[in-house]
Each structure stands twice: as structure tokens, then as C-alpha cells.
Amino acid sequence: VESALPKVSSICYSVGEIRPIEALVALGMADQNTIESLAARGIQNFCEDCRPAHDMCTSCIAGTLAESGLQPADIGAVVLGHSMAKWDLKEEQAFLSALAAMGFSRSQIFGVSMQACTVANAALDLARLLVSSTSGPKNALVIIFGKDSEGNRLAPQAATLFSDGAVSCIVSPGSGTLEIVGAASLTDPALAALEWSEPNFPKYLVSGVMSLRKVCESVYAQGRISARDIAAVFATNGSSIYLQMIGSASGVADKQVYRENLPRYAHVYGCDNLIGMRDRMLAQDFKSGEYVISVAWAPNVASACLLRRV
């Protein structure tokens, strides 16, 4: 009997030009000590996309539609999640105009904000709620993206290195490769006023680990499983330290944490989890019934999304 749970399919992504971290020196963003620090944390490259954000998105959307065999007219809802420091009315209008140029017409269009780089899980959660509704759309298009707008890809204290990128997928009640079992998120508003500096790192870490554990426990309970049932963890590629922390908080064996894309791409704004799923399944598919978990962490937000291979 086919499961009634909403399913994810046709994940496509774009990361622009992949450049070695040494290029940051010529760009005036880093010195040699910073390069060595990034390398020690497992980061070798970063991604730079000179296109406007809406062009980054439409290239992914075109790939998702082609792979799924769907047309814009088949999409009943669009869920947009951005992980950008600057997103304004001009950007919003450019994105909507780009959708119209692709053939999208009157439909439900939602934007997910205040989730930072955990936005993909929130967007998947909203999309699954939409298509699960008795009067909801048959197919929802999810598009996640982020792009450097500040001229500095380094997080404070060089804790991570940000890359440009976009990723899209279809969420529908019909066919798909991964079904969405559950989702959860937590935001700690008390951290918003804290400066991201070394003296405050312990506060961020304590709160972050606590929130990560809670959201993982929540989705395990929703799926009536335990951490032992997880075949893979797809996490925020902040650094090797991020991956170790997220893996520990999820309760999953360290070897199950997907790490291959950290050296390849660094931290692609908001997109790491879905990009990892795509690449891992192309390289080595999961067995039917196996569970995977998408776990994301930003300084004051933690989220998790539990999925199962169809």
C-alpha cells in the first residue's frame, strides 16, 4: 500500500563557480592564517555565483521541472526560502517576474523567513502541510537560495565560510523518492542580541546543542523511531566542528553524518541539507524504508526534518 505521506522528488541545485579558499586572499577577504584555519576545519573550496539571485533560482527550477516532467501549470504552490542578509521588495519583485517569465501564473506563493540557514527544513515542512490538506495543491515547488551580499564570505571569527547557491525540489502526495515523516524547529530569541564573538561562543553552543537535541527527539517521536534507525544525517556544513556537534546532538553514529560536500562547497546558504541528499542518493542510494534526517543549525535556530526512503 502506497504511503499517504508527502514526498520529495527532483532535487536540483546550482552553486556557480567552485573556487579554492586561497582565492579569498586575492579578494581581500582573508589572510594566510585564516586560510590555514579554514583548512583545519575541513574547508577547501567555496562557491561564487555572479548571477542575480532570481537567475540562480530559475536555473534550478528549470532542472527540477525537467526531471519531474511537470510544467509550471502543474505547480499549485511555491514555497520560497532565502538565507540572505539582505532581501527586499526589489528582490521579491524580481523573483516573481522571473517565475512569470517561466510560465507560472496565479498560484499560492509563500516566503519563509527568520530561519537563517535552517530554512530548507522549514520550507519542506510548510510544503508538506500544503499538499497534505484536502483542498491543497497537488504539487508544491520548494526553492531555497542564498547569495553573498556583504562582500565578505567569512563568518565572525572565521567560524564558517559562506557559498552562493540554490536548490529546488517538488513536494507532492504522489510519487517521490523520500517521504517527509516529521519536522520540528526551535528559535532561541535571547541569542539574537548577542554578538557573535569568542566570549559568547559557549552560550551559543550550549543553547544550540540543547535545541538540536530537542528537535531531533521531536522528529524521532513523530516517526516512532530512535536515533539507531537513522541511515544518514544531512547537516549544515559550517565546518567539521559543526558536523561533529550536529551528529552528536542527533544521537546518530558519527560515521552516518554526510561530510563529502564540506570540502567541495563549504557552507552553501540554506542549501546544504538538500544538496547532500541529492549527491548522496546519486552516489549510493538508500534502501527502501531507511530513514534519513536533515538537521540544521544557525546561531539562534535549530531544525530537523525526518524522511524515509520510499
Where are these regions (language model features)?
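Condensing-enzyme catalytic core mediating Claisen C-C bond formation in acyl metabolism
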Residues: 1-51, 154-218, 297, 308-310
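Conserved beta-ketoacyl condensing-enzyme motif
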Residues: 51-115, 225-243, 249
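Flexible, glycine-rich active-site loops centered on histidine and acidic residues
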Residues: 134-163
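Short beta-strand segments
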Residues: 81, 113, 140-146, 171, ...
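Claisen-condensing/thiolase-fold acyl-transfer catalytic domains that form or cleave C-C bonds
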Residues: 87-92, 105, 111-135, 231-310
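Short, well-ordered amphipathic alpha-helical segments that serve as non-catalytic structural scaffolds
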Residues: 53-69, 206-223, 276-280
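Conserved beta-strand elements of the Class I
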Residues: 9, 76-79, 139-141, 231, ...
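Acidic-glycine-rich active-site phosphate/pyrophosphate-binding loop
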Residues: 30-33, 90-103, 140-147, 182, ...
